[in-house]
């Protein structure tokens, strides 16, 4: 009888440990998911207004129309070579693209009012895998009204403006990658619309 | 000289290098340098550009001579700021006051002024756009830790001058007002030789 009790006792402890382990693992998973869903610093929630028109050519003359990119998240990034934070941020955009599935998030660079020579020389040095649309007279940038350069707008699969990044950042750092992966796998309707 | 593309690139890269270097230098230790205000959880930097710096930057971006000549009639002051307050800080340069050593108000040339000038000389849209993005916004509700920077342009004063800034705070501008001052700014008097083609 006492032996049974001992065996029972020995059996009970692993069960307790297993339960505690499961709780711990569950807590870690929940925390990780919650962290992944957190909005990292510097991203302003927008009101879901329709994105302004954007139809421009790149340096090779190829046309990109934002409307053709419906169905996936799009980052529209306005920049210029003379802008210090833009120069610092551009390599991180290239690394971000390398780490994100293209069907989830599409990066659209828009250079504001510079020449092919200026853009070609700069991108070739710091982000040779990226190409940029050319807003040659700056009118498209004006229509989008970024708060400054650089500015990144996150557009949901239905073509609505959901987030605006304030200034430059390391887009390839884990908090931003986790956030981008999280929003780009969630249905657009579930993205929070509360304005800060 | 203005038509020489190699010269334009050299001048542009030089100006860019100067700007980047000065930005790094200013960021190193804001409390120990002139041209810096720190307080109320915000940092403001202000630095008057020399005519050669201003001209080199825009010349390097392919601006036409007519626009460069207009720049020579103004002094460019580069201002940057960032705050770590929990509320909104309102950037509104129209509320700032610039005064010379005798206390006289120095006129600021805002975007309306420049738009009239560009229209009068039929400046290219690309150059107008670039110029506009290099200016400090006329109004901005700066969020916590949101960086902002750009130029304000003034009628060139003789001698040192001060910049007194006022920031409303809070979403509806109902928070405490922040007032600060940066002293000892100086604009160089002479025009840039790069515009007139007299550079050596």
Model-derived regions: residue spans:
Chain B
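Conserved functional micro-motifs across diverse proteins
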Residues: 27-200
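Intrinsically disordered, low-complexity peptide-like regions
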Residues: 1-2, 108
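Bacterial N-terminal signal peptides that target proteins for export
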Residues: 2-15
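Bacterial N-terminal signal peptides
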Residues: 13-23
């Amino acid at each position: 009888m006492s032996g049974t009790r001992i065996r029972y006792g020995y059996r009970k402890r692993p069960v307790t440990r297993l339960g505690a382990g499961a709780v711990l693992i569950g807590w870690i998973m929940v925390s990780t998911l919650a962290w992944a869903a957190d909005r990292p610093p510097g991203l302003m929630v927008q009101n879901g207004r329709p994105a302004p028109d954007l139809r421009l050519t790149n340096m090779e003359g190829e046309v990109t129309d934002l409307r053709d990119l419906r169905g996936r998240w799009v980052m529209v990034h306005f920049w210029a070579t003379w802008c210090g934070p833009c120069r610092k941020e551009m390599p991180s955009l290239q690394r971000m693209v390398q780490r994100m599935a293209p069907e989830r998030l599409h990066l659209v660079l828009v250079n504001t009012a510079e020449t092919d020579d200026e853009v070609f020389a700069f991108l070739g040095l710091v982000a040779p895998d990226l190409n940029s649309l050319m807003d040659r007279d700056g009118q498209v940038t004006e229509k989008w009204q970024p708060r400054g350069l650089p500015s990144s707008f996150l557009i949901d699969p239905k073509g609505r403006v959901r987030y605006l990044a304030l200034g430059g950042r390391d887009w390839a750092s884990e908090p931003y990658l986790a956030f981008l992966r999280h929003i780009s796998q969630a249905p657009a309707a579930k993205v929070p619309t509360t304005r800060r | 000289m203005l038509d020489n593309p190699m010269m334009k690139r050299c001048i542009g890269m030089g100006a860019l290098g100067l700007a980047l270097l000065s930005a790094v230098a200013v960021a190193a230790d804001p409390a120990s340098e002139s041209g810096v205000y720190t307080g109320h959880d915000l940092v403001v930097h202000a630095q008057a550009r020399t005519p050669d710096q201003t001209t080199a930057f825009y010349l390097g971006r392919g601006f036409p001579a007519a626009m460069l000549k207009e720049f020579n009639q103004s002094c460019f002051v580069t201002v940057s700021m960032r705050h770590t307050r929990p509320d909104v800080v309102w950037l509104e340069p129209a509320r700032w006051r610039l005064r010379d050593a005798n206390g006289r108000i120095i006129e600021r040339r805002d975007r309306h002024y420049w738009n009239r000038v560009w229209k009068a000389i039929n400046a290219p849209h690309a150059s107008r756009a670039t110029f506009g993005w290099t200016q400090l916004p006329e109004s901005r509700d700066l969020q916590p830790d949101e960086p902002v920077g750009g130029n304000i342009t003034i009628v060139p004063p003789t001698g040192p001058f001060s910049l007194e800034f006022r920031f409303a705070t809070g979403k509806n501008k109902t928070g405490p007002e922040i007032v600060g001052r940066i002293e000892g700014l100086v604009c160089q008097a002479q025009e840039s030789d790069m515009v007139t083609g007299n550079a050596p």
